């Protein structure tokens, strides 16, 4: 079952504990293989350098799409490709962001052996449905009573 989410832009989702910045979308990595993203000229997307932990604005380019690597790809490559840690700054102005989430089927096993990686596996091997269910728990939209 697929779900759609529209975020309320009238108030921040949270304030970053790292630097006190108001966020329209909390700091996270995407769950899937990759995300292809169109963002309008309002921007707001930031990516984090995994070594310095500094944040960098992703500039708007009308002729380009943004590609974020996801956590499932990190698992499949046994960490050789890292998921992109990112966030969206809070802005009350209307902002258009259109993501396409490239994800495997729910029964796909996230196993590095699919890519001929057999040694020193660093991640738990599971099917994508269980992996996704656990990954989505970090988002406020999914934090509601059963």
Each PLM stretch: what is its role?
Residues 1-6:
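Short, small-residue-biased leader/transition segments that mark boundaries at the very start
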Residues 7-44, 50:
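Short catalytic-site patches enriched in acidic/histidine residues
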Residues 22, 38-134, 142-144:
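Catalytic core of Fe(II)/2-oxoglutarate
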């Amino acid at each position: 079952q697929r779900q759609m989410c529209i975020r309320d832009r009238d108030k921040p989702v949270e304030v970053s504990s790292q630097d006190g910045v108001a966020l329209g979308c909390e700091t996270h990595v995407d769950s899937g293989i990759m995300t292809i993203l169109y963002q309008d000229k309002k921007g707001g997307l930031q990516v984090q350098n995994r070594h310095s932990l500094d944040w960098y604005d992703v500039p708007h380019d009308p002729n380009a799409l943004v590609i974020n690597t996801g956590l499932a790809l990190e698992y499949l490559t046994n960490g050789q490709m890292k998921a992109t840690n990112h966030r969206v700054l809070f802005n009350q102005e209307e902002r258009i962001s259109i993501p396409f989430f490239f994800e495997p089927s729910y029964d796909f096993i996230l196993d590095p052996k699919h890519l001929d990686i057999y040694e020193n596996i660093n991640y738990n091997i599971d099917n994508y449905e269980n992996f996704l269910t656990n990954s989505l728990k970090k988002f406020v939209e999914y934090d509601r009573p059963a």
